[in-house]
Amino acid sequence: MSKEEFMKIQTCVLKVNIHCDGCKQKVKKILQKIEGVFTTKIDAELGKVTVSGNVDPSVLIKKLLKSGKHAEIWGAPKGGSNNNQNQPNLANQFKAMQIDHGGKGGGGGGGGPANNNKGQKIGGGGGGGGGGGGGGGGGPPKMVIPQLTPQQMQQLNPQQLQQLQQLQQMKGFQDLKLPPQLKGGPGPGPGSVPMNKNPQMPNNPNQKAVKFNVPDDDDEEDFSDEFDDEFDEDDDEFDDDLEDDEFDDHPPPPNKMKPMMGGGNMIMPNNMMPNMMMPNAQQMLNAHKNGGGPGPAGGKIEGKGMPFPVQMGGGGGGPGGKKGGPGGGGGNMGNQNQGGGGKNGGKGGGGHPLDGKMGGGGGGPNGNKGGGGVQMNGGPNGGKKGGGGGGGGGGGPMSGGLPPGFRPMGGGGGGGGGPQSMSMPMGGAMGGPMGSLPQMGGGPGPMSNNMQAVQGLPAMGPGGGGGGGPSAEAPPGYFQGQVSGNGGGGQDSMPGNPYLQQQQQQQQQQYLAAVMNQQRSMGNERFQPMMYARPPPAVNYMPPQPQPHQQHPYPYPYPYPPQYPPHNGDQYSDYFNDENTSSCNIM
């Protein structure tokens, strides 16, 4: 017998039905006829037949069945020199592996401290940190695998070794307690950990879990300062264009295109008069310094996370504006927190984006304690310090240090803060619980309106001080519109007012010039009213109003019916010409 044949010898134990000696002889005879069987040993009482040889047990069973003897394997095959006795045990151990999914994660940690804003110098504080997220779900599945002894490891055939090594490399199995010969050390080979190429990082056996060595973030302050300084000068010119664009919230687009003629609510977008309204940025910043609340010189948000500062009209943060913690104070617009604690801006929160984005320091539900800026929705506490005449609360950007010839345009909502008075940057505070937009003629709702006094024209008196009565004193002798304490019709409802007509013409001319001329300054350069200046072309596509020929005041606030001018019906020949060809027929 060659060595190879000897190595292949297997011992197989079969259970065969043996009733008598005759059966025993018959079985022995059948088995010995089979090729590859060397010895047979039969225990008749137990029906146990032990066969050794180089033969497959299934062949033995087949031959016995053919002879009418039912046979089955007694236990698992026991190897001679192969030592396979432990295989069933090992299979059971693999079955016993439990896959344990991680338990539920713990609850999230509380929010961070209210004020992390290192780089914040002037503006209201940022909102408090949000609450921590809920704890993550349990970790990756853990496998509990029975401990294998080194003897058992040696008995594993290569396929099983490979399976174990694959298990070890799977995510979540790094903590398997395996003997060192299966846990690959550094170096090549299956299951080994790749060599560490970065000497600073410790060798990480968990190749899928990444740990970042990030240096402490000490330069956050420098970051915000660096950007703030870099963009400071740009802010001054952007302030005019961007800050008050249609009062910061996004109203219906048509308002930018033409003024509403009905009800006397003439909306003049603030960005249409940049250089006249904002003569220079320093005065604008000075105006901001009057903002209510502790913010030293509010209006500029310099929060840590902002790549560039946004200058707001709102005064400094109200209470909590300095600390930032209880809620983002200041004009909380670019601050992404948009008003400290959710919709109700807590102590200092500027509330929702629509509720006082530019308000100085918030306060009360959705309100702005400083009443500064253009808050669209001053809550119960709105305008505590009132925007009255540029005093008290932050007033608009124009509430302090105006050039000579301009009158301060404060809010008309009363010094003590009438019903939620709000200072518009255009002057004319918007009172009332929630008017639609800061509007400039007395119109729906208790609106107090101070139109800007244009050089060379009389100033308009207040048109119904919203709760605070008339808040800007027109100089004596000036025609004052119907002053009503609760927002009656403003001057626009009195068409016989010559000053009003002249001023409306001026406004329309300036508005049109702004539309055509975009952002160029127009205070002293264009469209000064001349003695016989014809009415400016209406912006809503109606022909001009021939006021001098009207004997009686037109009783309705909307435009006159179309009456074409006498010069050949061509109203476009001198559309932008100051010379009025239709006023005098004798040339």
UniProtKB/Swiss-Prot annotation:
InterPro entries assigned to the protein according to its UniProt record, in alphabetical order: HMA_dom, HMA_dom_sf
Compositional bias (Pro residues): 534-547, 554-565
Compositional bias annotation for Low complexity: 194-208, 471-483
Residues that coordinate or bind a metal cation: 20, 23
Positions of the pro-segment in this chain: 585-587
UniProt feature, compositional bias: Polar residues: 578-587
Modified-residue entries (Cysteine methyl ester), positions: 584
Record-level Gene Ontology MF annotations: metal ion binding
Keyword field: Lipoprotein, Metal-binding, Methylation, Prenylation
Acidic residues: compositionally biased ranges: 215-248
Residue segments, region Disordered: 98-146, 176-261, 287-449, 462-504, 532-587
Chain residues carrying a lipid of type S-farnesyl cysteine: 584
Residue ranges with Gly residues bias: 104-113, 121-140, 290-300, 312-419, 428-445
Biological role: Heavy-metal-binding protein.
Family, as annotated: Belongs to the HIPP family.
This protein's name: Heavy metal-associated isoprenylated plant protein 33
Organism: Arabidopsis thaliana (Mouse-ear cress)
